Structures are given as structure tokens and as C-alpha cells.
Amino acid sequence: MLKIKVKNIHSDEVSELELPEEIFNYPLKEHLIYEAVKNFRANQRQGTASTKTRGKVSGSGKKLWRQKGTGRARIGSIRNPLWRTGGTVFGPQPRDYSYKMPKKARRNALKSVLSDKLRNDRIWVVDEFVLDSNKTKDTLAKLKNFDFDKLLIVDKKENSKLMLSTRNVPYIKTIDFSEINVYDSLKYNYIMFSVDAVKQLVEVLK
């Protein structure tokens, strides 16, 4: 078992917490991390890009001039893709880019990222996020003792004051423990867990 120091919201050490090595001392597997990020981004795509083929472009079907004798190139339709106002050949059409990644591979990718963060002292565990108000200024004042540039806070959705007070801060993201993913874990340089959140995450990843 690994031991990590538990701090309060003011960055004072209050206790220690044991973390399982099979989750927080997992080897770095870059190929799994790559696949997990690719899967996450593909699932986020709207897939609404659409172009008009020659069959969808508006315009008459009349032949513009006779086939032979004019000296000009032959043309059958004003909607021909060769023309500026014509249709698009092989353009993008609406499609679903999402696909499923094996659950075990996805979990192992998350273990790999979390273990790497912990090895580099980029994971903090806080006993609890007790806030007096949902004002952004007050929350940032309490977090000022932690040295970070981009922070991912993992707690429970029930903590509405924390969610509301950080949602407008561009360099902080607060999520429920069930929403943690490889992409956000990589995007934010530091991760801050509440004790309850990290315990529940361990139960999920076991």
C-alpha cells in the first residue's frame, strides 16, 4: 500500500491515507493512454459536417447548350461538380464518430495516468471541501496555498457550493468522481481529490 498525506483546504497536513499499489503504482502504458484520449475525443465529436452532392444542389436539370457545334466544353448539368456552383465530390456527410473502448483497457489507461501523476507529486488529497459560500473569490482564497496552474478537482456532485464557485474559473474544473477520465486527467496538471472521492474511485477501479 502507498501512503499519501491528507491536507485540509488550507494545505495543512492533517493525516495520511493508504492507496492500493495496483491502482496508484501502475506502470506507464502510453499506447493505452493514446487509445483512451482518441476514444474520448471521437465520442465528443458532433459529426454534423455536411456538404451537398450534385443531387442535393439546387438548380435546373436542363442541358445548358447542345452537345456539339458550339466550340465550348460539353456540359450536361449546371450542378456538375466541375462547376463553381456545382455539387461536392466525396465531401463530409453527417456520421457518428463514437466507438466503444474495452472497459478494462479504459480503466488501465486511467490507472496509468493517475500513477504517473502521483509519482510526480501532482495529486493532492483533501479531507473535505467545506465552503461557507459559493463565491468564486472565497474559494480561490482558500486554494491559494496550493501551487498549481491548471487544477482538476474531484469530489461529489452533492457539493454544490464547490461546483458553483469554480465553474467560471478557466483553469479549474470540478467533476464528480464518476466523471473522471484520461483526457481531463492529462489536460489539468494537478488533481485534487476529496478523501470520499478517492475512496469511491478506488472501489470502482479495483
Regions found by a protein language model. Name each.
Residues 1-46, 91-206:
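Extended polybasic, low-complexity segments that bind anionic RNA or targeting/receptor surfaces
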Residues 30-68:
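A short, flexible low-complexity segment enriched in Lys/Arg and Gly/Pro that occurs
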Residues 54-90:
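Glycine/serine-rich anion-binding loops at beta->alpha junctions
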